[in-house]
Amino acid sequence: MDELGVKGFAYVIIRNEEKREWDIQVYVDPRERRKGIGTLLHQEIYKIVESENPSILVTGVRVDKENPAAFYERYGYKKWFGSPSMCYTGGVQPEVDIEFIPYEDKFYEQYAECRTECFYEIAVKNDFKPYVIPLNEKDKKTLSNKPIYVTLHNDQLVGAVTVEDGYLDHIMVSPAYQGKGYGKKITQFGINKALSKGATSIQLCYIEGNSKAENLYKLLGFETFQIMHVYREFMD
């Protein structure tokens, strides 16, 4: 910073204390780039986090506009995964012919099993650990406080969606019911539920390479507005 104002900044926050993962971000005003400011900021912020004995440094970069990935690659960061974000600004979707009810604790085991079946392959491919979240009271309590909606068939969980503050998350269909149009119906329900709660736009994201999810969301009117790539550097 000088008399003309802030030229750039950097910050670091703990991402996962148990795993000693830290998020690190460096930003330089576009008008001040290629002057070594980013390098100086990274050096200074690195000194701060180095004293905490980190295991992994993680940073997220937006690549659909300017792509600063090369800056981090110079310091040894490697791409971890990509996550496009999409936005829906359309109207109410056609009413679906399946019933949804709010999630309750009694669905926990079925929900956890469905979550594992739906996301295990993605977790392994992208090194999202733990690959399987074991049944535990902390997870159960977290889910009980989420605005999750489930649909059942003969008391068996078919699928679910979380609808929170205009954001759709964990859209999933049990493998036994996949390929039958449930993914579309669950997403349509999520859109309508978000709109009924007052949302004027609805967002979601997915992991890069999940073409089925991408195609479904585009079919329903979602448009990509941001693409983030996450990079990490192992320190141990």
Where are these regions (language model features)?
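A short beta-loop-alpha structural element at the N-terminal edge
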Residues: 99-113
